[in-house]
Swiss-Prot record:
Part of the 50S ribosomal subunit. Forms a cluster with proteins L14 and L24e. Belongs to the universal ribosomal protein uL3 family. Keywords: Ribonucleoprotein, Ribosomal protein, RNA-binding, rRNA-binding. One of the primary rRNA binding proteins, it binds directly near the 3'-end of the 23S rRNA, where it nucleates assembly of the 50S subunit. This is Large ribosomal subunit protein uL3. NCBIfam families: L3_arch, PRK04231.1.
Amino acid sequence: MGMKKNRPRRGSLAFSPRKRAKKLVPKIRSWPADKKVGLQAFPVYKAGTTHALLIENNPKSPNSSQEVFTPVTVLETPDVTVAGIRLYEKTTKGLKALTEVWAEQLDSDLGRKLTLAKKEEKKTVDALDAVLEKATEVRAIVHTNPKTTGIPKKKPEVVEIRIGGSSVAERLAYAKEILGKTLAISDVFEAGEIIDTLAITKGKGFQGSVKRWGIKVQFGKHQRKGVGRHTGSIGPWRPRRVMWTVPLPGQMGFHQRTEYNKRILKLGSEGAEITPKGGFLNYGAVKNGYVVVKGTVQGPAKRLVVLRGSVRAAEDKFGLPEIAYISTESKQGN
C-alpha cells in the first residue's frame, strides 16, 4: 500500500452555512477599545476602483523611495444624520436596551425606512439622564443621505454606531451634542488611519462545487460521461446521511465579510477631483466628499460599506505613504 499524499480539504468551513445575508446593511458585532470621544464607525457607498502611485516609505524594501503601482478604492462619503441615541446596560444575557431618544426634527425620507413616532410621544433628553447609572454603552442611531449621491434612491440606511470615550457620562455628553446634527467623514476618521471595512460581498448566485469550493476537476471517464465537475464522493454508506462538510453546489456570494487593517490614503470634500473621465462604472460621478482606501473593498458599486476603527491594528511602523499620482483616466475601456 503506497504512502497517502497530503491532501487538505477543499474550501473553508469557517463561513458555513454559505447563505445569503439577510440585509444589505452589515451587522457590527465588535468595536475597538478606544478612549477617544466620537463615533467609532461611518457608513459610506462604494464608487469604484482605480490605481495610484505611492512612494514606498519602507527603508528596507527593494523599492524604497520609488513609485509603486497600488490599487485603491474610492468610497463616496455623504454626511450622515444623527437621528437618535440609545443606551444599553450589561446583563448576564448580553446587552439590553434601556431607553432611546430621537431628534425633534427628522428627515421626511426616514419615514420610508422606519415608522416615526408622533411628536407628543417622543421622549426628551432627560430620559437618558434617568438611567445613566445603569448604562454601560452609548450608541448613536444614524442614517445615510443617499439622495445627495448619484444612487437612484431616497430611502436611507439606518446604522447603530457605538460612541467611544473613557466614561459613560463623557460619551452621553457627546451624544447630546450631535443629536439631530449631520456629521462628515472628517469628524470620525483622518488620513493615514487604519480601519476595518464591513460589507455584503458581490452575489454570484447558484454555483457548482468547483467554483464554490475549489474541488478538483475530474478527467478520463468522468469527462466522457459529462460529470467531470461533480463531487466524486459525497460520503460513506454509514451514517446514512450527507454530512454538512461535503462540498456541494449552492449559493455563492452575497455574504457579510469583514476585512481588517485597511489604510485611509486620502480624504477629500470635492468629488469632482477624484471622479474619472466618464464616471465610475455602474456608479457615475462622485458628488460629495470621498475617501481613498488602499487596496480593494468587498462588494459591488453602490454597495453600503461601513468603515470601523480597527479592532486588531498592528504597530504602524512607517505611517502614511506619499501619494505621487491617482489615476482619473476613463474606466470605460476606451
